[in-house]
């Protein structure tokens, strides 16, 4: 037994959440109540920010004040993260993407620029392919694991050759909706359970704030491939209709012997993403940052804002 069992989530806000400088609110999208924060002038262009896996909306809070000088900014918690609804058995890219389509319709209510990190970057790609006509003006994919988050990708390593074993570890010992919560047992088991090349992955004495706000069933959905069972990445990229995409590609190292990837995409996968987007008629601005961590907006917020503003200004020209 452990005192972390079933302790975290919207059912127990006092144990799970902390306050933030920017106010939060919930909107009813049907299956889920989506939590979000917004700042900026209502007359400014709309910018939707989509966090990555284990990240709540407040991962963007350092970047939001500068962005709010130019946009009305909306940062969301995806289903299963932050204060948004947990949906057992329902964590798929299509469900998450359609949540965002409804959010744009009901809350933003006008054409939107979208930027997403990691799995949020994959959802940014999803929106640029499958959102309603006219909803998305332009899309930024911030270090997205396109192909690399699939179990059987069309090119390059898949989820089980990169971060996947960590997701599997979390879900095994923490359980769907934190139903097991065996944090100490997970820490003890990690050295023998994780692949040798991941032995140094940090696991603290207690859950981080990010993990408290995360449903570990997300990790299982990626490990098993159910998250993308109906959303093949190559097909999705061939379907992109948004005219402009900014693709940022951050730190990555590939083991030549095993093919294991430390990072979100290999160079080959990034090249294939660009190739498919260009074939679809998209104008792609690819920017490589091999020394920048996975979350540029988290670790280098000024760099993130500068790049985003520069790219958007170029679109206006």
Where are these regions (language model features)?
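Glycine-rich His-Gly loop
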Residues: 49-52, 118, 249
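Conserved HGGG/HGGXW glycine-rich cap/lid loop of the alpha/beta-hydrolase fold
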Residues: 32-86
